[in-house]
Design a protein with these regions (language model features):
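A membrane-periplasm/extracellular boundary helix in multi-pass inner-membrane enzymes
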Residues: 191, 195, 213-256, 268-276, ...
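Transmembrane signal-anchor hairpin modules in multi-pass inner-membrane enzymes, especially those
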Residues: 1-88, 107-119, 168-180, 390-392
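Alpha-helical transmembrane segments of multi-pass inner-membrane proteins
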Residues: 19-21, 74, 99-100, 112-140, ...
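Membrane-interface catalytic loops of GT-C/OST-like multi-pass glycosylation enzymes that act
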Residues: 84-88, 142-151, 196-201, 304-309, ...
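Membrane-embedded alpha-helical segments of multi-pass membrane proteins
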Residues: 29-48, 90-102, 153-162, 203-210, ...
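Long extracytoplasmic/lumenal interhelical loops at the membrane interface
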Residues: 254-268, 276, 280-318
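Transmembrane alpha-helices of multi-pass inner-membrane enzymes
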Residues: 14, 37-45, 351-365, 369-392
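Selective detector of the "anchor" transmembrane alpha-helix that sits immediately C-terminal
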Residues: 317-336
Length: 392
């Protein structure tokens, strides 16, 4: 009780946020409870420090582009077919999921606390991947999903986090316990990828890991050996399993693979929606209903819930206005951190870039990641934590 009673408000906020990101995939309800507690505590923290609250410069910059994005998305919520659907979905998708970013940015400044939050989440994510592996090898399912949500949710997190793990392991800025947790998670992801069988996570990780490792492996030859050995081991392991070779080769199958054909069909339908509603789309939260009634092609027999692509989905749902807003917001984060990274070569700006690029723009080519509640909040968690580590 003595230790608990000595914890400050900042520590309690950090605990609640960390519990939220660790539990949000296991139990959405539990994750929401800790999320609400964190937000309420942060409101009290901000009020308590209202006369001397430190607001990082990046918060001021990103708040402007975030407000612009909301302004450009709003017409798709209120000026389309059904405001009773559009406005609540606007609040849920575009407002409710970002507070984790501002909570961390405004309330958590202690570097050790931030590192500990990362380490705890990485350990949790490793267990998440082992669960996905067990689900597959035990015969419970063909494709493991880990703690919860869809099979592609954990795949998107793999694509985002694996390159970040590599940066943490290669950069001296991170303490040993964070490196150990990243190494644990990276090893578990190998099992998770085996159980999850996401072609996207295999392909994108093989592309992104060498790219983000390049600034480090150019400095020390031993890093070249380590990265090549790790990639070689993974490739060799998968190549010895004929079923995985066949699944990987199916990435380019555009004639008989049902998953690929379904995506092509739904992309065509979403583009047709955009052609009919180019400015504001069919309306936030109304894509699937209108898709089923008016746009689903006869050959698309999976009755997909979304377009399996962030940007094609946005074209159909929010039109050019909404897509422009989203590109401005996330693009500003990437450009800002790239400029800082070029000047400072710090790992935190690099990891912040990786989080947004990999989750929104890379895996977002094969999945509608922006609408995944747990995934997008974990991305904002990673983004804010890295930026706070850089600024403190």
């Amino acid at each position: 009780m003595g230790v608990v009673s000595k914890l400050g408000l900042e520590s309690w906020i950090a605990i609640m946020i960390t519990l939220m990101v660790c539990l949000t995939r296991l139990s959405m309800a539990a994750g929401q409870v800790f999320y609400v507690i964190a937000i309420l505590l942060s409101i009290f923290y901000i009020w308590k420090h209202r006369h001397g609250l430190y607001v990082p410069s990046y918060v001021k910059k990103y708040s402007k582009t975030f407000a612009l994005m909301l302004l450009l998305l709003l017409p798709s919520a209120v000026l389309t077919n059904n405001i009773a659907v559009g406005l609540p979905e606007f609040i849920n998708v575009w407002l409710w999921r970002i507070p984790v970013f501002f909570v961390i940015a405004l309330c958590i400044r202690d570097k050790k606390t931030l590192f500990t939050m990362l380490a705890v989440f990485f350990v949790d994510f490793g267990i998440d991947n082992l669960v996905a592996f067990y689900q597959h090898v035990s015969g419970m399912t063909d494709r493991g999903w880990g703690f919860g949500s869809s099979v592609l949710t954990i795949s998107g997190l793999m694509v985002m986090l694996v390159p970040i793990f590599c940066v943490i392991l290669l950069d001296s800025a991170f303490p040993s316990y964070v490196k150990a947790s990243a190494l644990w998670a990276l090893g578990c992801v190998g099992f998770g990828m085996y159980g999850n069988q996401s072609r996207g996570s295999w392909l994108f990780s093989m592309i992104m890991v060498p790219i983000v490792s390049l600034p480090y492996i150019l400095k020390r030859f031993i890093y070249v050996v380590v990265v090549l050995a790790a990639l070689g081991g993974v490739v060799w392991g998968f190549s010895t399993q004929p079923q995985y070779v066949a699944r990987f080769e199916s990435i380019t199958n555009t004639t008989t693979d049902g998953s690929n054909l379904g995506r092509f069909d739904v992309w065509t339908s979403s583009i047709n929606m955009f052609k009919d509603h180019p400015v504001t789309g069919v309306g936030i939260g109304q894509w699937r209903t209108i898709y089923e009634v008016s746009y689903r092609l006869p050959t698309e027999n999976q009755h997909l819930y979304h377009a399996h692509n962030n940007f094609i989905q946005l074209l159909g749902e929010v039109g050019l206005l909404g897509l422009l807003g989203v590109l401005i917001f996330y693009g500003s984060i990437i450009v800002d951190n790239f400029v800082i990274w070029v000047k400072k070569r710090d790992p935190y700006s690099l990891c912040a870039m990786i989080a947004v690029i990999c989750y929104v723009f890379v895996f977002g080519q094969v999945e509608y990641t922006l609408d995944n509640s747990s995934g997008i909040r974990i991305m904002y968690f990673m983004l804010a934590t890295m930026l706070q580590l850089r600024d403190n």
